[in-house]
Amino acid sequence: MPRELIADRPGHAILSTYEEQPLAPDQVRVTSLFSSVKHGTELRGFRADTPDASDRWDGQLRLHRRGESTGDDFLRRLGNMCLGIVTEVGAEVESLKVADRVFAHLPIRETHTIAANRLQKAPDGVSPQAIMYWDPADFALGAVRDGSVRLGDRVAVFGLGAIGLMVAQAARLGGARWIVAVDPIERRRQAALRHGTDLALDPTTTDAGLEIKQLTDNIGADITFETSGSYRAFEDALRTTCYAGTLVSTAY
């Protein structure tokens, strides 16, 4: 029987067998070639370190109801993205064929039976590892579009994981003339500098908000992106942003 990676309790992962469902006319069967987790959000969920683990989500109000039980036994599949190869095609599927490389937001398991319209074809010549970055790139692009980066803007990015690094690069493509990156991890700051930021600050050794204000003639950043999910970073991002500026929070 095929296997999948699941969490049966906070912080504990196991391999579990499962039975694959019959193939419906609009579905395809996919054999996994490469899968990945989401380093930030998913690992916090794996550790039960998010409101999803303690407070019931109200889909109508779009908020967590504090103190109300989720009724969740915690059992959940792990994994965020998967690249695979189509091995079977339903009778009504015309968009895909056997041997196509496809990818989607899917958990870590050996096979997937899924509607064809939920899958995207993988471009030729693109590695599985690169395709896994489709997810953070999607969030980064959405953040930069929400921030409405314009030609000549001064931009600050707090949190230099994959999303933050891509936000900085997308902001430059959007016309930002000066970009400062903030993260306590040295190798992340160095990566930001290699990819085009003008300055990288360590918030554990400097007052990032104060320094950025001073570096911008006491004005601050026109647009600030907070991608780390840290309350301290969010506070620093607020202090960094200029009067009537824009702060985009992308973290969960």
Regions found by a protein language model. Name each.
Residues M1-L75:
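Short N-terminal strand-loop motif that marks the start
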Residues D72-H105:
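A glycine-/small-residue-rich N-terminal strand-loop-strand element
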Residues R77, H105-A116:
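A structural motif shared across PLP-dependent enzymes of the aminotransferase-like
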Residues L106, D183, A251:
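Conserved acidic E/D residue at the C-terminus of a beta-strand in Rossmann-like folds
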Residues S127-T205, L210, A244:
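Mid-domain Rossmann-like dinucleotide-binding core that forms the NAD(H)/NADP(H) cofactor-binding site
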Residues H195-Y252:
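Glycine-rich cofactor phosphate-binding loops and adjacent beta1-alpha1 units
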